[in-house]
């Protein structure tokens, strides 16, 4: 089976880098303690059962018998302990959030692992799949420099597919794991992850049958209507239920005048999200109303009771805010200039950037678009902080601990870590609310706290929230059982099969 991954990842070190183009490959190789059903309830995987202590301060996992890593080493509780304490807690970009309460892992025997927590962590059971907290082989990493270990790009896991080959600029080949612990699986002999930079060529590969699957909107939204008329192809929006995402603008508050709330709010008012939805996303998604995806409505954490930037007199408001901030128009009609870093993950983001340039010019902000390769873009924004406005789309994970904490907590201003608080937002009141919500076991009380947090963010406007993203997968009709759960392409294709 050939799947398209766009763009090519810089590494397969899934435990240390969280870019969205890594999991479609890495989750074929690495597994987690649990997986999830369509209702997002945890189901057995490397763990067969678990018990949460009455005080919420420990979780005891019984581990599966007969599981071996791709190098032949048996899977034991020592691998769980090493993965959590020596790799994930130290190197995973989101460990300061997901594993903040983890103090240790007890291993009373080879098939029992006990996660010890300083405080209850109600979000943790939603983050134990291979996508978020994968389990690695202790013997591969022990005594080595974790980030320089060769298995970063030749990974060794317990999953249904083994790493085969990486031809840089072309493809990664994964081979069937003949010793996989699920009898008879996987069905496919190989998965080829192809890297095709050009959007038209990606679409052509699917239309001719050269490729069988493209997830995470690797196909341009503009091409989807044509794809739907092709008898070889079909599309689905399933498989993204645990991957809510927002298209946003990150505003560097270290670069005046973006340090002024009025300027950030003016930018938010200046943008017509309905135009982006129509002309860039071709109707897929919905206008974002605030800092959390509307997918969180199903669990009671989302609210639209926040400052509304999508109002009829938005341009008048934007101009008044900019005037009030002491930023008059010059002779050319512009108030000030800024650079916009264009998202490198697809051509639709360039189209969005071109619209943003037009929209902000109306209120006197002169945007210069800057497009670079993915590695340069990420380094410029998250390591060098050499940017004014950035145009990412941000995965919000399975809990507001992902969607809010990582993006807005003061503690998440972490130089060199991607997709965290690079806007330098710092609000002690907000921090206190999120830290309380993170440890609150009562769901209703958490919901009240998150509503307040969203209202504060919408007022402070550290980011501009554009589109509640709807991902789309395109697949060949001869490919079956490719999307079998709410993690979609970020879980293994163990049951996928191709008609001959």
Predicted region positions:
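Ligand/substrate-recognition segments at binding pockets and active sites
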Residues: 3, 168, 297, 323-397, ...
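Surface-exposed binding/hinge segments that line
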Residues: 51, 62, 96-141, 165
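N-terminal lobe/hinge region of extracytoplasmic solute-binding protein
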Residues: 4-54, 85, 154-158
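Long beta-strand-rich cores associated with HINT superfamily self-processing modules
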Residues: 473-500
């Amino acid at each position: 089976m050939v799947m398209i991954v766009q763009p090519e990842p810089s590494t397969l070190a899934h435990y240390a880098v969280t870019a969205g183009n890594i999991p479609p490959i890495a989750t074929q190789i690495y597994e987690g303690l649990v997986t999830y059903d369509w209702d997002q309830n945890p189901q057995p995987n490397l763990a067969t059962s678990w018990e949460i202590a009455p005080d919420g301060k420990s979780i005891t996992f019984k581990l599966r018998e007969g599981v071996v890593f791709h190098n032949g080493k048996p899977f034991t509780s020592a691998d769980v302990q090493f993965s959590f304490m020596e790799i994930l807690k130290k190197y995973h970009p989101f460990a300061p959030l997901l594993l903040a309460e983890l103090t240790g892992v007890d291993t009373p025997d080879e098939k029992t692992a006990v996660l010890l927590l300083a405080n209850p962590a109600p979000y943790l059971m939603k983050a134990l799949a291979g996508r978020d907290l994968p389990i690695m082989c202790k013997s591969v990493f022990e005594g080595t420099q974790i980030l320089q270990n060769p298995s970063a790009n030749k990974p060794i896991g317990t999953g249904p597919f083994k790493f085969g080959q990486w031809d840089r600029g072309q493809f990664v080949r994964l081979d069937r794991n003949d010793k996989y612990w699920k009898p008879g699986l996987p069905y496919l002999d190989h998965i080829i992850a192809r890297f095709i930079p050009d959007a038209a060529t990606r679409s052509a590969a699917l239309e001719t049958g050269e490729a069988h699957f493209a997830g995470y909107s690797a196909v341009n939204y503009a091409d989807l209507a044509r794809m739907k008329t092709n008898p070889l192809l079909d599309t689905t929006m399933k498989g993204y239920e645990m991957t809510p995402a927002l298209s946003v603008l990150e505003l560097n508050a270290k670069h005046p005048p973006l340090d002024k709330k009025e300027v950030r709010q003016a930018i938010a008012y200046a943008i017509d999200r309905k135009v982006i939805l129509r002309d860039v996303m071709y109707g897929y998604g919905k206008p974002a109303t605030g800092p959390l995806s509307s997918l969180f409505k199903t669990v009671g954490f989302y609210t639209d009771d926040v400052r509304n930037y999508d109002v009829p007199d938005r341009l008048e408001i934007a101009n008044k805010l900019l005037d009030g901030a002491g930023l008059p128009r010059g002779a050319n009609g512009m108030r000030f200039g800024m650079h916009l870093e264009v998202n490198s993950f697809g051509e639709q983001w360039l189209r969005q950037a071109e619209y943003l340039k037009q929209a902000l010019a109306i209120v006197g902000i002169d945007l210069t678009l800057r497009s670079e390769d993915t590695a340069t873009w990420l380094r410029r924004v998250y390591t060098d902080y050499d940017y004014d406005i950035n145009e990412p789309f941000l995965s919000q994970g399975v809990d507001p601990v992902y969607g809010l904490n990582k993006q807005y907590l003061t503690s998440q201003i972490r130089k060199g870590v991607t997709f965290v608080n690079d806007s330098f937002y710092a609000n002690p009141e907000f921090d206190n609310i999120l830290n309380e919500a993170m440890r609150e076991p009562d769901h209703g009380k958490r919901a009240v706290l998150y509503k307040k947090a969203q209202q504060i963010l919408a007022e402070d406007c550290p980011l501009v929230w554009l589109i509640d993203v709807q991902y789309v997968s395109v697949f060949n009709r001869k490919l079956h059982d490719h999307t079998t759960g709410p993690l979609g392409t970020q879980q293994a294709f163990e049951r996928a099969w191709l008609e001959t």
